[in-house]
Amino acid sequence: MAASTTCPARSMASVSRALRPRPHAAIASAAVRTAARLGGGLGIVCSMPSYGRKEKEEWGLTIASAPATTAAPALRSCQLLCKAEANISSNLPESIPSEANQYEKIVELLTTLFPVWVILGTIIGIYKPSMVTWLETDLFTVGLGFLMLSMGLTLTFEDFRRCMRNPWTVGVGFLAQYLIKPMLGFAIAMTLKLSAPLATGLILVSCCPGGQASNVATYISKGNVALSVLMTTCSTIGAIVMTPLLTKLLAGQLVPVDAAGLAISTFQVVLLPTIVGVLAHEYFPKFTERIISITPLIGVLLTTLLCASPIGQVSEVLKAQGGQLIIPVALLHVAAFALGYWLSKVSSFGESTSRTISIECGMQSSALGFLLAQKHFTNPLVAVPSAVSVVCMALGGSALAVFWRNRGLPANDKDDFKE
């Protein structure tokens, strides 16, 4: 198998599987679990076929004999990842089906084009809403739960241990997600004097956990992908308490907020599927590998629908008040990106970590916000900011990631991540 020069998801998969038998494998395995989930909210998981123990041990010995610097910064440099794959490519089993490689290329192409699918979904949602509005609350809940399950399938107990080894770095990201972002949502809603339903919707979406699209944007921007995974995981788990609590505190004065109902729904849709996925990966790894192999394309389609459906369901409102609604939501995301980056620099983090925290702060699970708004608020306008946020988040995050990618990283960039 020739080494790739475009560093596709299979490159990360090759590196991760080669490193996994070695003591310092966690960082590479985090990369494959994230980069293979490329795309929007996404729960999209690519996987390499399972190989025998002998081949894995041979790969591990191959990497162990290579210079330590080959793998250490792998998460932050596509070039080094590609180089690492070149180093181990001669040791890969020749029996890898070409169809599997082609499948992974197709999945990567589809997932990295996520912003394009969001734009198409937005157009369809506005002008042909009947094509996507069939995905109503119950089906929407199942779809979002499936994506959270697929994210859980890529996590292990070791990921949570790494959170404990990086309390300050992960903690700053958590602070940005659940302090800066909600306060921004509240301040913008009050400053622009939004109506009570729209203000509540803006506050609700600002209190949602990080979205998996942030992992993709971090990868593109040359940020710390492993750190992005950890912060998304932590904010997802914390959502069961933080999302209903902050929404109640900040929006309770505007409309009645059922904090208990929000907590229960968040647990059912976000936390429970994630826990099931983690346990399945930990105790039934072979079974999990088989599931992961068939989820990518399903995830691409499902994620596009979960982005298009909210737009379709509020299309009439968007046609009538589109400009008025876009401004506060876009301002929320832009300010969150900027303040997340500033907070990281104030905390003396390196450029890679600062980009990661900025993206994590600016991109959240808008689909969860839309679902909670539909289930727990009687006024349909509460769901509108979350629908608009789907588009603003995807386009804004992608644009920022491409901008940073073209700027590169300082040669002496500080590494704030501890294995």
From Swiss-Prot:
Protein name as annotated: Probable sodium/metabolite cotransporter BASS2, chloroplastic
MF-aspect GO terms: symporter activity
Sequence intervals crossing the membrane: 106-126, 137-157, 170-190, 194-214, 225-245, 259-279, 291-311, 323-343, 384-404
Factors inducing expression: By ethylene, gibberellin and submergence.
Transit peptide interval: 1-45
Keywords: Chloroplast, Membrane, Plastid, Symport, Transit peptide, Transmembrane, Transmembrane helix, Transport
Lineage top rank: taxon: Eukaryota
UniProt xrefs under InterPro entries: BilAc:Na_symport/Acr3, Bilac:Na_transpt, Na+/solute_symporter_sf
GO cellular component: chloroplast envelope; membrane
Membrane topology, from the record: Multi-pass membrane protein
Organism: Oryza sativa subsp. japonica (Rice)
UniProt function note: May function as sodium-coupled metabolite transporter across the chloroplast envelope.
Organism phylogeny: Eukaryota, Viridiplantae, Streptophyta, Embryophyta, Tracheophyta
Family to which this protein belongs: Belongs to the bile acid:sodium symporter (BASS) (TC 2.A.28) family.
Compartment annotation: Membrane; Plastid, Chloroplast envelope
Keyword Transit peptide applies: yes
